[in-house]
C-alpha cells in the first residue's frame, strides 16, 4: 500500500554491543533474544545459571572486572525491508544511521519458535521481554494451551471442570470471554471453542 506498517512482524531485530573502555569494534554473533541475558552476564563476569540455555554472543573479547551494563531495548524496532512500508526506513533516524556506519550489528530472531510462540507467529513485546530476561526460550500461553489440548490435559483442568460442573449442577449459565480471532498474538478463537467441548 506504500504506507508504513506498524503491526507485529517476523523481522529479525538488530543487536549491538559497545565497550566504551575499548577501541575494538565488537561483532556479536547472530542468535535469538534468549542470548541477550547470557551475553550480559558474560560482560559482568557472572556465571550463567544452568536454566539459561541461551549463549554468549560475544566470544572473543575480554571485558575485564567490575563492569556495568546499560541495556537499551528499542521495542518494535526490527530490521524491516528498506521500502515505504518500513517506518524506521521512512523516518529520520540520524543517530541510528550513524551507529550503523560505525559499529557492527548482529541480528536476533524475535518471533515464532525462537521466542516460545507457534511456528511462524509474529513476535510481540511480552514474548520478547520474557525471553530476554530468562535467557532461555519461554513457551508462551498459546503454545502451552495447544500442547495441553493435544495431550488432553486441557480437558482435565480441575478449575475448568469444577466451573462447568457447578454450572451444570445449578442449571446456571457459563460466560466465556476470549479473543475471537485467528491472527492475534494475544489469543485465538480455538481456546474458548475447546472449552465448549
Segments and roles (model prediction):
Residues 1-197:
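Feature captures the catalytic ectodomains and active-site-proximal regions of enzymes
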Amino acid at each position: 500500500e506504500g504506507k508504513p506498517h506498524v503491526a507485529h512482524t517476523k523481522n529479525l531485530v538488530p543487536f549491538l554491543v559497545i565497550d566504551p573502555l575499548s577501541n575494538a569494534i565488537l561483532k556479536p554473533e547472530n542468535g535469538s533474544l534468549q542470548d541477550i541475558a547470557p551475553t550480559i552476564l558474560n560482560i559482568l563476569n557472572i556465571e550463567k545459571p544452568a536454566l539459561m540455555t541461551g549463549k554468549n554472543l560475544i566470544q572473543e573479547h575480554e571485558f575485564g572486572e567490575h563492569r556495568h551494563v546499560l541495556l537499551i531495548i528499542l521495542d518494535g524496532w526490527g530490521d524491516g525491508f528498506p521500502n515505504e512500508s518500513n517506518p524506521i526506513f521512512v523516518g529520520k533516524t540520524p543517530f541510528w544511521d550513524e551507529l550503523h556506519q560505525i559499529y557492527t550489528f548482529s541480528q536476533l530472531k524475535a518471533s515464532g519458535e525462537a521466542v516460545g510462540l507457534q511456528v511462524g507467529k509474529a513476535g510481540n513485546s511480552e514474548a520478547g521481554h520474557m525471553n530476554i530476561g530468562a535467557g532461555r526460550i519461554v513457551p508462551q500461553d498459546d503454545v502451552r494451551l495447544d500442547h495441553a489440548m493435544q495431550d488432553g490435559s486441557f480437558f482435565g483442568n480441575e478449575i475448568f471442570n469444577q466451573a462447568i460442573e457447578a454450572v451444570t449442577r445449578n442449571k446456571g449459565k457459563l460466560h466465556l470471554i476470549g479473543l475471537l480471532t485467528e491472527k492475534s498474538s494475544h489469543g485465538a478463537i480455538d481456546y474458548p471453542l475447546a472449552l465448549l467441548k
